[in-house]
Swiss-Prot record:
Annotated compartments: Cytoplasm, Cytosol; Endoplasmic reticulum
Residues with PTM N6-acetyllysine: K3, K212
PTM annotation (Phosphotyrosine): residues: Y223
Organism: Mus musculus
Keyword Acetylation carried by entry: yes
Similarity annotation: Belongs to the AHA1 family.
GO biological process: maintenance of unfolded protein; protein folding
InterPro entries for this protein: Aha1 (IPR036338), AHSA1-like_N (IPR015310), ASHA1/2-like_C (IPR013538), START-like_dom_sf (IPR023393)
Cross-link named Glycyl lysine isopeptide (Lys-Gly) (interchain with G-Cter in SUMO1), sites: K182
Residue numbers bearing the Phosphoserine modification: S193
Identification of the protein by name: Activator of 90 kDa heat shock protein ATPase homolog 1
Keyword Cytoplasm: yes
Length: 338
């Protein structure tokens, strides 16, 4: 745990604008233990991995001992969390044989980075050997570690609200300091599909783009990735908030992407109003995602209408890099496992 007066400068704020207790140490403490318990259970129980040997999933959280809290001392946020965790997992081979096992995480604490958290996987007593253990130790542990990272990230975003007041210059401090969406170039797989420029929304020239990508997962799982807050935060590596219902709002990638869901059909279709922060005020594109089952794989068809014409290539690159490649790298949906 960080020492008093030390820590990440992103969490340090200036003297308070209201001058309250400016020259004294002032404590504000928030207990995050109950929230952490539910958040960790949700994240761990969502872990599922699969390859040609079969599939594995976390089925039970049978021990979750510890506590979490946040302290604000004169503008410095100090996070404390310490957990000992035991999970049960079940593996099912392609032939239908089931295996039981355990996961132990003895040192999830603020004193360890995500990479330093120990995660051990084992078979239950008297279970025969199976190659599914290797699947769980490699891909399962990867997703468990990502779940730990999401927990830490959301702890530092959801529970800091209201704990730091505006600074003397009237500005608030961004407690996370995540990078904004960048505009590096990358080669998209699909060729441009332009429509004739036409005015829409706030009368600007617009165009249409289409992209197709194949993911090595089911439509059900890929749909969850786009509609579950924790999973969106995982593949964007930044805070996000979303309500996956018709009319539900979303914002992600440090507020650079915002919008509203207009239609959702689980495992089949998502339609949304969508915009970059840099676009003209009030202008949204219409994005449609169609999920097509391809015998264990999913073909995702993305169509974007009303894209500002000067933003066509940036939007295409953003979807290819931050959505498609981000999802594949985070969840392992881009390459077969042998």
């Amino acid at each position: 745990m960080a020492k008093w007066g030390e820590g990440d400068p992103r969490w340090i704020v200036e003297e308070r604008a209201d001058a309250t207790n400016v020259n004294n140490w002032h404590w504000t403490e928030r207990d995050a233990s109950n929230w952490s318990t539910e958040k960790l259970k949700t994240l761990f129980l969502a872990v599922r991995v699969e390859n040609e040997e079969g599939k594995c999933e976390v089925t039970e959280v049978n021990k979750l001992d510890g506590e979490a809290s946040i302290n604000n001392r004169k503008g410095k946020l100090i996070f404390f969390y310490e957990w000992t965790i035991k999970l049960n997992w079940t593996g099912t081979s392609k032939s239908g044989v089931q295996y039981k096992g355990h996961v132990e995480i003895p040192n999830l604490s603020d004193e360890n980075s995500v990479d330093e958290v120990e995660i051990s996987v084992s078979l239950a007593k008297d279970e025969p050997d199976t190659n599914l253990v290797a699947l769980m130790k490699e891909d399962g542990v990867k997703l468990l570690r990502e779940a730990v990272g999401i927990y830490i990230s959301t702890l530092k975003t959801e529970f800091t609200q209201g704990m730091i007041l505006p600074t003397v210059n009237g500005e608030s401090v961004d407690p996370v300091g995540q990078p904004a969406l960048k505009t590096e170039t990358c080669k998209a797989k699909s060729a441009p599909s332009k429509s004739q420029a036409k005015p829409v929304g706030v009368k600007i020239p617009t165009c249409k783009i289409t992209l197709k990508e194949t993911f090595l997962t089911s439509p059900e799982e890929l749909y969850r990735v786009f509609t579950t807050q924790e999973l969106v935060q995982a593949f964007t590596h930044a805070p996000a908030a979303l309500e996956a219902d018709r009319g539900g709002k979303f914002h992600m990638v440090d507020g650079n992407v915002t919008g509203e869901f207009t239609d959702l059909v689980p495992e089949k279709h998502i339609a949304m109003k969508w915009r970059f922060k840099s676009w003209p005020e009030g202008h949204f594109a219409t994005i449609t995602l169609t999920f097509i089952d391809k015998n264990g794989e999913t073909e995702l068809c993305m169509e974007g209408r009303g894209i500002p014409a000067p933003e066509e290539e940036r939007t295409r690159q953003g979807w290819q890099r931050y959505y498609f490649e981000g999802i594949k790298q985070t969840f392992g949906y881009g390459a077969r496992l042998f």
